[in-house]
Amino acid sequence: MTNGTVVRSMVLPDGYIIALDDGMISWRPSSGRRTNYRLQYPAAVLLGMMGPTGYCESVVIGDTRGNVIRLSLPRLELLDACETSGSVIRSICRVSNSSDRLLVGDDSGHVWLIGRDVPNNFLLLFKHDECITSIRTQDNEITIQSGWSKYHYDWEGVMKSNFDRNELFHQKQIERTNRRAKLLERKGSNSALVAMLDLPMIS
């Protein structure tokens, strides 16, 4: 029995998985007994891995210390574990439905490739300049989300395009500041004109 706080959860057709702030991972089936597995550090992200049967057969967990752990479902047996840079794992995606390779993005902007057929089981592909909040791959491109901003990289780490929302927000702020300055200037001019009209006439 654990009294930890739920920090992550994932709903599946046959039950749901919760991750607690004390590192506990719990599989809670719709019927049957619960299964628990305790990690050394709390989970930061969960990813369900569908197998050839069409069902979710394992769960990948990225924790707050840069570890990526894969557990079987429903028994929560340890299948793989990999330690990256020590930064919080923020996002994980599967390279393809037919591959067990994973793309992993962390709090420091590192992009990792993880898999049993990867040298040393993990490889640093490149480093993004900001915290990675979302990562996915499609059409030989890696798409990274950092907050509101989106970036497209090739697999060599060369940026192909980007849409930086921060620049847009900054531009909007400048436009608002300029509009406000013009309004204040206009108001000041009108006030001076009104003051002149209020002066007594000298004959």
Regions found by a protein language model. Name each.
Residues P29-G32, L73-L76, R116-P119, E156:
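Short loop/turn segments that connect beta-strands within beta-propeller blades
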Residues N3-M10, Y41-G51, S87-R94, E130-R136:
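Canonical WD40 repeat/beta-propeller blade segments in eukaryotic WD-repeat proteins
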Residues E130-T133, G147-S203:
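Terminal intrinsically disordered, low-complexity extensions flanking WD-repeat/beta-propeller proteins
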Residues M1, R33-L39, E77-C82, N120-F126, ...:
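A short beta-strand motif characteristic of beta-propeller blades
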Residues Y16-A19, V59-G62, L102-G105, I142-S146:
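Conserved beta-strand element within WD40/beta-propeller blades
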Residues P13, Y55-C56, S98-S99, D139-E141:
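Conserved loop/turn motif of beta-propeller repeat scaffolds
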